[in-house]
């Protein structure tokens, strides 16, 4: 046990460094920036401050003040999620930010005996289901935004949400956090069977019952497709493709990006974000300085040597979406992402075929008013080799994938190694040799079986 002297010093430090500054900024209507930011900072900071206040402040009125602040400002963090539940920050920040939101919710529910519950909205149900819907196959998730390659959704989050919603086919599980993790966020895992159950209003029940299709997930607000093979089929190829815009949280200027998994391996596509951030990673010129943050490090086109522009005006327009039991098609217009008057139209179409062993096709068609240089790219951490002028072979683990290049003219290939505070990967540039006013490049990816 801590001595009374140490406890007094801790109480004093928290008052001077945490509680009084928070009280002062709120009373002067100048809340710290994280109170109204629409990303993970809001939930993480509110969970820490609210939990500290509930644990350390002896006065009930003081504790109520901090609960009221959480009740007022937690909505800003929720604005960072689309209404359909999509997390534009990526799976890594979903694990971090939504876990903090879960902790905040538990703190407030327990302090108010469930009278104040931040989960009483249909949007929460959709955010809670993101952890399952974003998975392609075998727990593999697309590494969009600043998600680290190889991350999956924390088991605890899915387990907790299932128990809160009453949809769990299993009991809560006690999971001991791995070494080095933030104990304040992860200690909740020590106490299974403690999730505060959600009051089942008609709106909540309706949101829970919204159809979940195991073959595909489409986030209409964000323009994100996840397509999976049929159960017990010969296909173990799964994909995701993204539209969206280049003003999203932790965005990489990469509308039109995609991810391809085969078995238990990510074979090609988006390689995610760095494992630690360079000091100027969030500066305006970072997409040009760090390939992993810009178009060059992603499986998207370069138009006349230009990368995609930053900002909401770079918006993927969904032209067509056809999701069936055998094949999924997703077509988007990428024209606004490239700042060149020569380009009149750039269309990208994704086609996922789940029959037999499966296939995935990415097709770019462009139209210009003057000859342009057009290039697309394949990004991968797999071992690869060029078989002939129009075929590549990718190999990772026990999996192999054949890539066929079908273009309107002859192509040349380039190879660049990209590494920014994380695992190295290869960018294979696929370039039309001649400048032309219109053309197409189609990449057809198929598993290669022995």
Cite the ranges covered by each PLM segment.
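Residues embedded in well-ordered secondary-structure elements
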Residues: 38, 216, 247-249, 253, ...
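CBM-like, beta-strand-rich accessory domains located in the C-terminal region of large
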Residues: 175-182, 274-450
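Short alpha-helical segments and helix-capping/turn motifs at coil-helix boundaries
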Residues: 35-36, 243-245, 286
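Aromatic-lined, polymer-binding surfaces characteristic
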Residues: 1-135, 140, 147-148
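Extended glycan-interaction surfaces of carbohydrate-active proteins
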Residues: 1-30, 55-80, 157-175, 180-196, ...
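Carbohydrate-active enzyme catalytic cores, enriched for enzymes
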Residues: 56, 96-267, 323-324, 435-436
């Amino acid at each position: 046990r801590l001595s009374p002297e140490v406890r007094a010093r801790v109480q004093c430090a928290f008052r001077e460094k945490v509680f009084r500054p928070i009280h002062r900024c709120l009373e002067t209507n100048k809340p710290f920036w994280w109170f109204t930011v629409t990303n993970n900072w809001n939930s993480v900071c509110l969970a820490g401050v609210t939990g500290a206040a509930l644990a350390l402040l002896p006065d009930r009125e003081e504790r109520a003040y901090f609960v009221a602040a959480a009740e007022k400002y937690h909505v800003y963090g929720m604005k960072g999620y689309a209404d359909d539940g999509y997390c534009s920050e990526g799976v890594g920040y979903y694990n971090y930010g939504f876990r903090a939101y879960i902790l905040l919710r538990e703190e407030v529910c327990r302090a108010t005996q469930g009278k104040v519950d931040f989960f009483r909205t249909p949007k929460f149900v959709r955010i809670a289901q993101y952890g399952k819907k974003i998975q392609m196959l075998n727990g593999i998730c697309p590494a969009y935004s600043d998600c680290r390659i190889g991350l999956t959704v924390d088991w605890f989050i899915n387990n907790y949400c299932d128990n809160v919603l009453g949809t769990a086919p299993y009991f809560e599980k006690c999971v001991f956090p791995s070494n080095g993790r933030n104990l304040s966020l992860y200690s909740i895992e020590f106490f299974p069977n403690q999730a505060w159950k959600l009051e089942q209003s008609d709106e909540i029940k309706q949101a829970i019952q919204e159809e979940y299709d195991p073959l595909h997930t489409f986030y209409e607000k964000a323009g994100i497709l996840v397509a999976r093979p049929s159960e017990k089929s010969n296909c173990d190829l799964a994909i995701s493709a993204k539209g969206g815009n280049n003003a999203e949280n932790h965005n990489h200027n990469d509308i039109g990006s995609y991810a391809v998994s085969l078995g238990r391996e990510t074979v090609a596509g988006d390689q995610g974000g760095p494992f630690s951030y360079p000091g100027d990673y969030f500066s305006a010129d970072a997409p040009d300085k760090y390939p992993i943050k810009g178009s060059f490090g992603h499986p998207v086109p370069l138009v006349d040597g230009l990368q995609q522009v930053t900002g909401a005006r770079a918006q993927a327009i969904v032209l067509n979406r056809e999701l069936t039991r055998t094949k999924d098609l997703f077509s988007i217009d990428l024209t606004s992402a490239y700042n060149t008057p020569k380009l009149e139209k750039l269309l990208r179409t994704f086609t996922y075929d789940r029959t037999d062993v499966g296939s995935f096709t990415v097709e770019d068609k462009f139209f210009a008013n003057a000859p342009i240089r057009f290039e697309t790219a394949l990004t991968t951490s797999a071992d690869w080799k060029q078989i002939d002028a129009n075929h590549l072979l990718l190999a990772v683990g026990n999996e192999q994938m054949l890539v066929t290049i079908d273009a309107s003219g002859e192509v040349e290939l380039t190879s660049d190694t990209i590494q920014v505070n994380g695992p190295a990967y290869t960018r294979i540039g696929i370039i039309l040799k001649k400048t032309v006013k219109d053309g197409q490049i189609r990449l057809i990816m198929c598993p290669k079986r022995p």
